[in-house]
Amino acid sequence: MCIRDRYVRQPLVANQVQFSIPVSNLVANGMEVNMETPGSVDHDGSLLDYCRLHDITLQAWSPFQMPSWKGCFLGSDEYPELNQKIRVLAEKYGVSDTTIAAAWILRHPANMQLVTGTASEKRLKEIIAACNITLTREEWYELYLAAGHPLP
C-alpha cells in the first residue's frame, strides 16, 4: 500500500476483498499469532489493519463462497458443523441462513460492506435483513470455529 500512496494521489476509499466465513484469511493472521498454522502467515501485508487505520472501507465479495471456488458453503456437505450453527442462529433470530452469513461479515468491527452480485430479489432481501442483526461476539467466534479455523 505504501507504493500506491507514493504514486497515486486520489484517496483510496474502498477495497474489495474475498471474504466469507470459510474464506477468512483477512482476519486469520491477526488471530493465529504465534501459531504454526497457514493462517498465521501474513499473506496480505496486514491489509485489514491498513484499511482500518486509513478509513478505507473493505467490501467483501463472494460472501457465501467456499475456498477454491467450490461453490456456496450454505447447505454444503463440506461444512456440516458451520451450517448447523448457522441454522440454529437463523432460528434464534427468525431469519434465513443467508442473513446470518451476511451478518457475520457485518459484525466485524471494520464495518465492512457486502458485494452481493445477486440477481435474486429474495436473496437480496435476505442480505439486507442482516443489517438488522447484530451477532454477539460469542456467536461470531462460534461460526468462525465451526468453519474449521483455529484459535490460540
Predicted regions mapped to residue ranges:
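Beta/alpha (TIM)-barrel catalytic core signal, keyed to glycine-rich beta->alpha loops juxtaposed to Asp/Glu
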Residues: R4-P152
